[in-house]
Amino acid sequence: AVSRGVAVVGTGINPGFVLDLLIITLSGVCADIQSINAERVNDLSPYGPTVLASQGVGLSPEAFAEGLEAGTVVGHIGFPESIHLIAAAVGWDIERIEEKREAIIAGVVRETPFVRVQPGQVAGCLHTAVAYRQGEPIITLSHPQQIHPQLEGGETGDRIEIKGTPDVRLCGSPEIPGGPGP
């Protein structure tokens, strides 16, 4: 690539593609942009114990809160980096980013080969990041990750909404699969 003067971009599904490069690509059709909102709802059930633990799956709500404080429950990794990448691509300066992680509480039994979640326990983590520009929210990324969302009427998928000229809305369901991790 260097000898030919070209760039090569390699990405994962998320982070990398869905809540990063795909948003940037879609923004290219806009003459101006007022805001960007994106959400990725995925099913964690194919993933292993390391990923499930990082989302607090199987914990009590109290243990989830303790895990947030201790740094063992992390939610999605990479929201600040994704936001800064998007902002740089569209020419925005970001003042601050606020992140929020909330437990998704199961109302029914949800089970994977690695964990059985009872009603009242944590089935996943809703992680949201909001970037501000000139005091206003300008980029919102949301990632509710949980095991078997369909058991309570949830549907996996990826959604991107760009408010601008023109408005752009892209929705895909089911989610673009990211592949199981450890």
For each predicted feature, which ranges?
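Glycine-centered flexibility sites
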Residues: 10-12, 16, 91, 164, ...
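Catalytic-loop motifs flanking and including active-site residues across diverse enzymes
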Residues: 18, 78-82, 182
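C-terminal helical cap and adjacent loop that interface with cofactors, partners, or active-site loops
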Residues: 1, 147-182
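Active-site-lining helix/loop region of Rossmann-like oxidoreductase modules
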Residues: 27-158
